[in-house]
Amino acid sequence: MLTLLSPAKKLLSISKHYSKETSNPLLLDKALQLVKIMKLKSVEQIADLMDLSRQLAELNYERYQNFDLKNNPMNHSYPALFLFQGDVYQGLNANSWKDEEIEYAQSHLGILSGLYGFLRPLDRIQPYRLEMGVNLENPAGKNLYAFWSKIVTNILNQILAEQSNPVLINLASTEYFKVVDEKKLSYPLVTINFYEQKNSELKMIGILAKKARGMMAKYIMQNRIDSIEQIKEFSESGYLFNKEISSPNSLNFI
């Protein structure tokens, strides 16, 4: 199985030092095409493009200007698993993982990215800000979905083909998973959702759902889950699988 997560806007200022072997992003050449486009943007244009404050726009302007295209794009880079922070990654709590769990995740966990397309946990990336939903004009079209959809879908099919149980587990947000062309997926897709029950009414509360997605990904990686039935046994933070509101392609927890 391959489990998908979204990235995070918030990045750790100092990433965990990981002494084992790391990797380069599979789609680095494509990512550098987007970096070249972003290098041409002014602070004001970056602020407008991503609806950022002046301070954040200046930070990301500097990030793109300092992005080393010619010599070593991996300069000042960190493993994606440890760089991303935020609600999902609090639930994931990768700093507590054992080395063998990280190694397992390298071929069973993926992170969708507006800049890098698709990332494995140990892929080294530079700090950046570029959400998948941004309308950044590029050679493929008017937004990043046009740029990445075919490429990301193809890489997912390639990775799934190497899995013993080729099922795509979607724990990503709607904004990010839209980049996947479901019609072109060659393997089954299962989306997992988390709800809160308030006065007999079910609601998806963003911050709680994000943390739960991270906890589910952690559960799958640390226990080397390889079947849908095992996923249904997840019970962290009181969440339980609810058969009545679920379907073969949508597993819902309350």
From Swiss-Prot:
Coiled-coil ranges (or none): none
UniProt GO cellular component terms: cytosol
InterPro entries associated with the record: YaaA
SS bonds (residue pairs): none
UniProt GO BP: response to hydroperoxide
Domain of life (superkingdom): Bacteria
NCBIfam families tied to this protein: PRK02101.1-3 (NF002542)
Family: Belongs to the UPF0246 family.
The protein's name: UPF0246 protein lpp1320
